[in-house]
Amino acid sequence: MAPSNLPPVFNATSQDIEMLLAAQCHLGSKNLQVHMEPYLWKTRPDGINVINIGKTWEKIVLAARIIAAIDNPADICVISARPYGQRAVLKFAAHTGAVAIAGRFTPGNFTNYITRSFKEPRLIIVTDPRTDSQAIKEASYVNIPVIALCDTDSPTEFVDVAIPTNNKGRHAIGLIWWMLAREVLRLRGTLANRESEWDVVVDLYFYRDPEAEENKEIEETKVPGAEEVGAAAIESGLVGDSWQAQATPGFSAGVAVPGTAVPGWEADVSTDWAASSAPAAETLADPAADPSVKW
């Protein structure tokens, strides 16, 4: 990392640098825009352009100082048409008081005063100059300064402050917005000092797939845990001695169980059957013996 041109109080800590590297904020694309060349550290053998993390931190601090200089936070508009940045801009707006536009940017928001969504911000911050080009173009018509998260292949036309970073990864985008919000709160005095940790974790700024979260909840509700299955088995008496107690002792010991005679069974067979068959025989023989019966 190149030596920093910031005052010592704004220097990045080793933890900040480790977080930027872990989120892959230093990995750009294979294409290089000529205006992004000053932020380039080197090009890897596979063609990936590596961004200078020191320049990234300097631009984060510069952007935070610009944001903190605006008296009314509602005059700041944060924009992200890229899905990976929509959750981040909403969290940034909630923590700093800015106005968020997550999703499609309606043309005419900054130029057509007849529309309901007309806004007159003093500063806009975009996640990607390529996907948010409509907002940058309209800001140039009405002289609104623009801060943008720029990759090595991002167009920098009409961008006043470019924060060099990877603006295509979900973790890189979330981390940059989280660091920007933290620096703004430090400059405003919301956080006591730079040594105090922010109680908001960076995971809140990361993109979450709604379908993946829904499927995860369904799986958790369908599959019971091992502890629940064990508890249910114990309560139903199917574990340990209870299972043997419920089973027949004779079968468990492997000894044949002698049959129990039913009282009166043989007597019923010998008497009842003979008694019931005698009248039937007589009734069958009577018609043949009687000559008066006509068939």
Swiss-Prot record:
It comes from Paracoccidioides brasiliensis (strain Pb03). Component of the small ribosomal subunit. Mature ribosomes consist of a small (40S) and a large (60S) subunit. The 40S subunit contains about 33 different proteins and 1 molecule of RNA (18S). The 60S subunit contains about 49 different proteins and 3 molecules of RNA (25S, 5.8S and 5S). Interacts with RPS21. Belongs to the universal ribosomal protein uS2 family. The keyword Cytoplasm applies. The keyword Flavoprotein does not apply. The gene is RPS0. It holds the Pfam family Ribosomal_S2. One of its GO terms (molecular function) is structural constituent of ribosome. This is Small ribosomal subunit protein uS2. SUPFAM superfamilies: Ribosomal protein S2. One of its GO terms (biological process) is translation. PANTHER family: 40S RIBOSOMAL PROTEIN SA. Coiled coil: none annotated.
